[in-house]
Amino acid sequence: MTADKQSSTLKLNRLLQLCSANLPVGGFSFSQGLEYAVEMNWISGQKSTFEWIELNLSESLSRTDLAILKRLYQALDSSDFTAFKLANQHLIACRESSELRFADLAMGKAFVRLLKQLDSLDSEPYSELLNEPELSFVSVFAISAYLCELDLTAAQSGFCWTYIDNQVAAATKLVPLGQTQAQNLLFDLSAEVDHLLTIANQLKDHEIGGSLPRLAMASAWHETQYTRLFRS
């Protein structure tokens, strides 16, 4: 096996590790408003689950998280920590409810704690960024993927998968869905990733951001939902 092949294999393994549901950052604790949507019967089966997640991907994740992930990578490439911090602040400001902001920051904080303890990744050059008082999960994901020498497309694709996997896992418990239905959703939603990356990477700075009022309201109302499995 050639060195290039070994490098390619290692990078794939690192990507799989970063996107694993076993990554101890608490993603399983948050439904991102989906729990309230199920409570209100906005989501009741495989079709409506697909529509809910696909809308969030195309109108929010691609136009905010993925677009800013590109800016974060550009900032890391040029060692422009000021630009990185501004992009991070932009991400946090785009969270449309207290719960969505809390979920993003809580996962970011857990990821920072993990990253600093990983022996195989030297995060010291980015200690200034990692010691910021508030870091979005997306920002820490960007640093981790960059340290693993993943290219932007791999990082963005992996981030998409992380979101899709988390949402489908939450829907499987909440709707509920069967395991085969969940696998069909994973296939169908992951087929959208190329299109999502195209949208994200064509956006100009002033075009970044998208509002989903129903998601924001579901997340806000979830705070007072009578019974809950998830923290958001």
Curated annotation (Swiss-Prot):
Superkingdom, natural source: Bacteria
Main location: cytoplasm
Subunit annotation: UreD, UreF and UreG form a complex that acts as a GTP-hydrolysis-dependent molecular chaperone, activating the urease apoprotein by helping to assemble the nickel containing metallocenter of UreC. The UreE protein probably delivers the nickel.
Pfam families: UreF
Protein's job: Required for maturation of urease via the functional incorporation of the urease nickel metallocenter.
Source organism of this protein record: Psychromonas ingrahamii (strain DSM 17664 / CCUG 51855 / 37)
Protein name, as recorded: Urease accessory protein UreF
Subcellular locations according to the entry: Cytoplasm
MF-aspect GO terms: nickel cation binding
GO-annotated cellular components: cytoplasm
PANTHER family listed in its UniProt record: UREASE ACCESSORY PROTEIN F (PTHR33620:SF1)
Coiled coil: none
Family in the record: Belongs to the UreF family.
Keywords, comma-separated and alphabetical: Chaperone, Cytoplasm, Nickel insertion
Gene3D superfamilies: Urease accessory protein UreF
TM helices/strands, residue ranges: none
InterPro entries named among the record's database cross-references: UreF, UreF_sf
